[in-house]
């Protein structure tokens, strides 16, 4: 154990040394608030439903609750989550977008959690749900990071025996936290934070995140139903479509639009706004390869006619040769053969 600690510290130090300013600042804030909790009461930094709403308006807790931890194992989870996000998501998004994602998820978790406990109080009239419950910690952001990893690298294998992919990690961890809650080993705010982190991060990444191709990610593998087992996906997909249609009618969400830009007869440009660039490029290459192979097979069949046709044509040429009505076309002056290959080009971004 003593030999492993220096190696772990050296590895962690190397990771932090190569991290961006955003990752370093978030890690430093988590450590500072944890050390501060030994000197003063940091309860005012967590979201308390009764104090977030009027007449108190503890609005600053929406920004601080995701950085506040009370146990050393919680600090380890927070630091690991931030470092993983910096290593895997920041190279794809950039430091600013990672900070925006962190802020959106944590503010959403604070608001949704406070509203949920407010509704629970209205149903039970138990003041514990207003003034005793404290929402804090990095479980909400952890849920958001897992959703983002499902979007970007869902096919990666985390465990080989049994085989567990990144795409199933969000719901697998939710089921584990639910079991811990049923066994009274986990408090309800932690489970609520993780659940609302999953939901808010998916909504942001699906509909609102800005990138070079527009907004959001409407890929099929990132649909809400794909978070659930296959047997439940048809029912969940139907309910999700109904909710989305309702949100479109009240103008909270935008209607999904797929734009097809046909530039010329020999060139077709297909633009699907809201898709991940890597996923879109992979789909284009697969479609192009399959289409070229099919066209090649058709051309081969037209080039090699049957033997009967060859015999009939040769017999006709020997028996009754006819002069050609048309003069042979000089090489280089005829029409160039039209290419049968279809290429995919990136369409200009929609304004």
UniProtKB/Swiss-Prot annotation:
Topology in the lipid bilayer: Multi-pass membrane protein
Keyword Cell division set for record: no
The encoding gene: TMEM115
Protein's UniProt keywords contain Methyltransferase: no
Coiled coil segments of this chain: none
Assembly: Homooligomer. Interacts with COPB1. May interact with LMAN1. Interacts with the COG complex; probably through COG3.
Protein source organism: Homo sapiens (Human)
Annotated TM spans: 20-40, 98-118, 127-147, 166-186
Cytoplasmic side: 1-19, 119-126, 187-351
Location of region: Mediates localization to the Golgi: 206-229
Disordered: region residues: 301-351
Keywords: Golgi apparatus, Membrane, Phosphoprotein, Protein transport, Transmembrane, Transmembrane helix, Transport
Gene Ontology cellular component terms for the protein in this record: Golgi apparatus; Golgi cisterna membrane; Golgi membrane; nucleus
Residues that bear Phosphothreonine: 329
Stated name of the protein: Transmembrane protein 115
């Amino acid at each position: 154990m003593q030999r492993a600690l220096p190696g772990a510290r050296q590895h962690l130090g190397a990771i932090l040394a190569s991290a961006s300013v955003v990752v370093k600042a978030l890690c430093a804030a988590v450590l500072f608030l944890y050390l501060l909790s030994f000197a003063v009461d940091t309860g005012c930094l967590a979201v308390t439903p009764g104090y977030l709403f009027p007449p108190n308006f503890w609005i600053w807790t929406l920004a601080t609750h995701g950085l506040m931890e009370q146990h050393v194992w919680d600090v380890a989870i927070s630091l690991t989550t931030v470092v993983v996000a910096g290593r895997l998501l920041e190279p794809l998004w950039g430091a600013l977008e990672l900070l925006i994602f962190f802020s959106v998820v944590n503010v959403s978790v604070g608001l949704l959690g406070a509203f949920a406990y407010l509704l629970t109080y209205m149903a039970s009239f138990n003041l514990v749900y207003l003034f005793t419950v404290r929402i804090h910690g990095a479980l909400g952001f952890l849920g958001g990071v897992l959703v983002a990893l499902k979007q970007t690298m869902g096919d990666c294998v985390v465990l080989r025996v049994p085989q567990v992919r990144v795409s199933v990690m969000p719901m697998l961890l939710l089921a584990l936290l639910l079991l811990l809650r049923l066994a009274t080993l986990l408090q309800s705010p932690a489970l609520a934070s993780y659940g609302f982190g999953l939901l808010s991060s998916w909504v942001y990444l699906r509909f609102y995140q800005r990138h070079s191709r527009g907004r959001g990610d409407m890929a099929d593998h990132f649909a809400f139903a794909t978070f659930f087992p296959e047997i439940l996906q048809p029912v969940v997909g139907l309910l999700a479509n109904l909710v989305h249609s309702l949100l479109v009618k009240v103008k909270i969400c935008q209607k999904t639009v797929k734009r097809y830009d046909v530039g010329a007869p020999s060139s077709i440009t297909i633009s699907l706004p809201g898709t991940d660039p890597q996923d879109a490029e992979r789909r284009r290459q697969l479609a192009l390869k399959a289409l070229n192979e099919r066209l090649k097979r058709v051309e081969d069949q037209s080039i090699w006619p049957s033997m009967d046709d060859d015999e009939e044509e040769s017999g006709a040429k020997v028996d009754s040769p006819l002069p050609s009505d048309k003069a042979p076309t000089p090489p280089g002056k005829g029409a160039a053969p039209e290419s049968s290959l279809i290429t995919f080009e990136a369409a200009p971004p929609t304004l």
